[in-house]
Structure formats: structure tokens, C-alpha cells
Amino acid sequence: MSSRFNKDTKEDVLKCLYYEDTPANSLISLQVHKVYDLVDEIIVVGGYKYEDLKQFIREQMKDVNHKLKLVYNDHYHDYGSGYSLLKGIEVVSEQTDEITFIEGDLFFDTESVERIISSKKDVISVNNEPILSQKAVALYFDANNYPHYIYDTSHSCLEIHEPFTAIFNSGQMWKFRNPSRVREVCQFLTPEQEQGTNLEIIQKYFGAYKMSQLDIVRVSLWYNCNTVSDYRDSINS
């Protein structure tokens, strides 16, 4: 709910709506405009300050909002991020042949997201940042070259208890080439998994593929905007 971000703002804001100078500099506007011509529909899942989100899209994104579906997550305050992904997947059009998932607090370059969306494989993204437990989602491949994600919600320490062949900082963008399998994964989540992070769904889907079956796309310019300082760094990059 943007708690780290709002430490640096005069009043509480939804961080994907925060901007300086012009609304076009908000993360949601930047993200949507970068992918707009590459996809058939864009699903935005909100919860915290949902009315602000609706109003911003209606008033500041008129040029693209006809392609948007806006979905309300009524458990944003007591469930983890996985429920937002689950709610988004529920409204994906039946005829969709692939799904690209992007976390809402990211800043990235256009060329990298184009590589993700145009890939002919399932895609895992990585970035060039150091792996720091207080903010990174780490990705490693085990001795058999299957992927595993690790993240500490308390931002304390990360632990790996098995041999691994590679380790990356996740770019927190993924492409699912098999929507039917995504829906199947979601269908068999336990109540506890539904309340967890989005890595529950992501791990169950991608954990079945070896590295050679995936396209690992390195995002050239990448910021996870946890703070206003992160946001400013991204805009000035």
C-alpha cells in the first residue's frame, strides 16, 4: 500500500499515480504507453486509493483508456500481491493467446519490454541491479536448471538451501505463453497461496520449465520505485 513511498510525500498517494511536472510522467502512464501498441488489452488491478486510480485513468489517460480493463481487488489490505494477479487473470479475454504481467511500480525501457512481448517463448526477465535482500526478488536455477524465486517480505535476508547453477535479480516482468495453464495453476491454489505473493502463481507456472525452454530477457534500464528517490532517479535516467 505504498508505505515506503509515502514516507517522502506530503500526503498518501498511490505510487503508480505519483508524478512530477506532468501526469505523463506517472509510472502507470509510462507503462501503459510503452506497451499500448504491442498488446490487445491492458488490465489494471487496483485496491488502495482505487477511486483515485479510476479518476486518473479517466481524466489523464483518455488516449489509451479504451484498451484498459480496471479491476478492483477487495483484499488489497489483508492479502498479498498474488491476489491482484489472480483477479487480473480472471478477466483476461478467452481468446487471449499469451499474457504479459508487469508489476505496477516499475520503470523500464521500451526496447526491453518489446523483447519480452515479441518473444516466441515463455519469458522471465532479469535486471542488472545487485541482489539486495531489502528490495530484490531473487531468481536462481537449481542443479537441474529449474527456476526458483525467493523474496523476503520483511526485507531481511534471503536463503538458498540447495546447489544452484545461476542467480539473477528478477526484472519482475513475465510472459506466459499458455493462458490455459495459467488458469489451471490459479484454479488449484490453496487458500493460503491465494493470500500470498504473486510468486505463488509465477513459481507454479515457470517452475515446470528448464532454463533452455525459457527466454531470459535482461532489462537494460530498470528501476523498482519503492521510494520517491527511486522514482526521481528513474525519470532522470
Please report, for each region that a protein language model flagged, where it lies by residue.
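N-terminal glycine-rich phosphate-binding loop and ensuing alpha1 helix
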Residues: M1-E51
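Hydrophobic packing residues within well-ordered alpha-helices of enzyme cores
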Residues: F5, V35, L53-I57, V185, ...
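Alpha-helical elements of Rossmann-like donor-binding domains used by nucleotide-donor carbohydrate transfer enzymes
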Residues: L30, D52, L86-K87, R115, ...
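General small-molecule cofactor/ligand-binding pocket signal
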Residues: I43, K69-V71, D215-V217
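Acidic donor-binding segment of Leloir-type glycosyltransferases
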Residues: Y48-K69
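Conserved core of the sugar-phosphate nucleotidyltransferase
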Residues: D109-Q193
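Conserved alpha/beta core of the MobA/IspD/sugar-nucleotide pyrophosphorylase nucleotidyltransferase superfamily
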Residues: A166-S237
